[in-house]
From Swiss-Prot:
It is a peripheral membrane protein. It holds the Pfam family ATP-synt. InterPro entries: ATP_synth_F1_ATPase_gsu (IPR035968), ATP_synth_F1_gsu (IPR000131). It is found in: Cellular thylakoid membrane. F-type ATPases have 2 components, CF(1) - the catalytic core - and CF(0) - the membrane proton channel. CF(1) has five subunits: alpha(3), beta(3), gamma(1), delta(1), epsilon(1). CF(0) has three main subunits: a, b and c. GO terms for molecular function: ATP binding; proton-transporting ATP synthase activity, rotational mechanism. It comes from the Bacteria. Produces ATP from ADP in the presence of a proton gradient across the membrane. The gamma chain is believed to be important in regulating ATPase activity and the flow of protons through the CF(0) complex. Its main location: membrane. Keywords: ATP synthesis, CF(1), Hydrogen ion transport, Ion transport, Membrane, Thylakoid, Transport. This is ATP synthase gamma chain.
Amino acid sequence: MANLKEIRDRIVSVKNTRKITEAMRLVAAAKVRRAQDQVLKSRPFADKLARVLENIQSRVQFEAVDSPLLSKREVKSISLVCITADRGLCGGYNTNIIKKVEIRYAELIKQGYEPNLILVGKKAIGYFQNRKDKYVIKSTFKELEQVPTAIDSEGITNEVLAEFLSENSDRVEIIYTKFITLVSCAPVVQTLLPLDPQGIAQENDEIFRLTTKNSKLLVEKSNLEKNESDRLPSDIVFEQSPDQLLDSLLPLYLQNQILRALQESAASELACRMTAMNNASDNAKELASTLNLTYNKARQAAITQEILEVVGGSAV
């Protein structure tokens, strides 16, 4: 059995670690709220843009419009945009998304396609750059804001557009972590390009709100409802041709989709970090309790031994 000083030092160390993990949990909770606020602030523009595209879709047939972002061609090369975090200590967040990318990459190779990677986040960059013999990396992005903004999504959008319009990639998919609840998030695969005309309208869109109840953090979700007043008048006349309108609006729509994926990923990362730090705090509390019990037993045994030695010495 370890001596009393070693056990006492271990107890102090565990308690200090618990203070750190608890502080990190609270910081992550505050940042989740910031991520929530950012989503809500960007929502009006995203909603209005989707409504405008939906109305244009109802006025013209997208299939008859010559827009490069809507054109489908024979698929040979596919770009995968992978979004991970720059830091760890967030449970299985990074591991799960990297596994999803590996599985999807292997599937595409098996199907005869030529996949390549556009990596976002230091964790993905570090992992796949150490395996360059197995994966083709097109570009990397790191050190984005913890609460993503349009500036963060702009660079990724430009790279995605350049790959697709130059026909270096015939399809672009994004793999990110969808925010579900504070204790649940899942990696998902979504096609970015070519854009699907039938998928312009944001159906079943959700807004999440982080609230507190009985000193516990909860997530409230509500579906985004369409506002009939947003519909354009049927007699409105567009000065620009449908091609010009779509060439201006579709890149904005694409950037908004990427921004949303970044925001969902950021919220998922912070939620996973909250959960991981909460579990670490609970484990530290349990370990400290066990060590206290061990310390008390060791101290009792030492005292008993000293008493026996004193009694034995008196008898002699």
